[in-house]
Design a protein with these regions (language model features):
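Substrate-binding pocket helix/loop in short-chain dehydrogenase/reductase
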Residues: 115-116, 120-126, 208, 219-220
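Alpha-helical segment proximal to the catalytic Tyr-Lys
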Residues: 144, 186-190, 248
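Short C-terminal tail/terminal secondary-structure segment
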Residues: 2-8, 162, 222, 240, ...
């Protein structure tokens, strides 16, 4: 009975998870939740300004009674080399022959508020290099080390299926993420690996602060569940479930985490 209770309490025991862009916001919440469920977690970040936040998150995780391990990997995932830099840093910890990754959460992203007349090619590259190419390159870097019955969870957005004024680049990039999710599911499912996406509605974060207030207020007013914003904990719990054994028959799906604002 004790073993069964332990497995239920820590469904991700000894799994290695990578959570990109996890120094703050939803990413940090996901890293914490996966660790709380037993996973060892690699936290990726890009800016030196995020180091203190990463250290605080790692210290918080280290206080969990089951003592999950954490690693911090600094890399710019908008570049063509960033994803491989994350893997190289993990290989330095584990050794090339011993690295086995069980969970990848593609979360790192950026947005830009500009009407189409003002968008430049540089703007396009800034958003798509991280939000789309970055996810693809991270997948390519991880797959050689991905364990059977692996879990890939991509962070999308309700914006992938709704047109919002001034954020066309962000919305289009998230639509691409959803298409990636379905295609990768068809490619990787043979060994029990699942690939899913979570599409949050508005959640308090640095990123949300850049979205026009009228868009956020409209979403709150039209959200059936309590007419409020979501929380990082609510999004992280969905990701935690998708990463675990109970979600083994769910794949190729986009889960709208928006309190009913967007219904798929």
């Amino acid at each position: 009975m004790g073993d069964l209770e332990s497995q239920f309490a820590l469904p991700l025991q000894s799994k290695l998870a990578i959570v990109t862009g996890s120094s703050r916001g939803i990413g940090a919440g996901i890293a914490w939740e996966l660790a709380r469920r037993g996973a060892n977690v690699c936290i990726t970040y890009v800016s030196d300004n995020s180091k203190l936040l990463v250290e605080e998150l790692m210290a918080k995780i280290s206080q969990l009674p089951h003592k999950p391990m954490t690693w911090a990997c600094q890399a710019d995932l908008s570049t063509t080399t960033g994803a491989q830099e994350v893997i190289s840093q993990l290989k330095a910890y584990f050794g090339s022959d011993d690295l086995q990754i069980h969970i990848l959460v593609n979360n790192a992203a950026t947005e830009m508020v500009k009407n189409i007349q003002s968008v430049t090619l540089e703007d396009y590259n800034k958003v798509f290099n991280l939000n789309v190419r970055g996810y693809m390159l991270m997948m390519q870097a991880v797959v050689p080390y991905l364990a059977s019955k692996g879990r890939i969870i991509n962070l999308s957005s309700v914006g992938a299926r709704v047109g919002f004024e001034g954020v066309s680049l962000y919305c289009a990039s998230k639509a691409a993420v959803e298409s990636f999710t379905r295609s990768w599911d068809s490619e990787l499912g043979g060994d029990g690996t699942t690939v899913n996406a979570v599409a949050p509605g508005p959640v308090p974060s640095d990123m949300l602060d850049k979205i026009p207030k009228e868009i956020v207020d409209m979403q709150k007013a039209r959200t059936p569940v309590e007419h409020r914003l979501g929380t990082t904990e609510e999004i992280a719990s969905i990701v935690g479930w998708l990463a675990g054994p109970d979600a083994s028959w769910v794949s190729g799906q986009v889960i709208s985490a928006s309190g009913g604002w967007s219904m798929y």
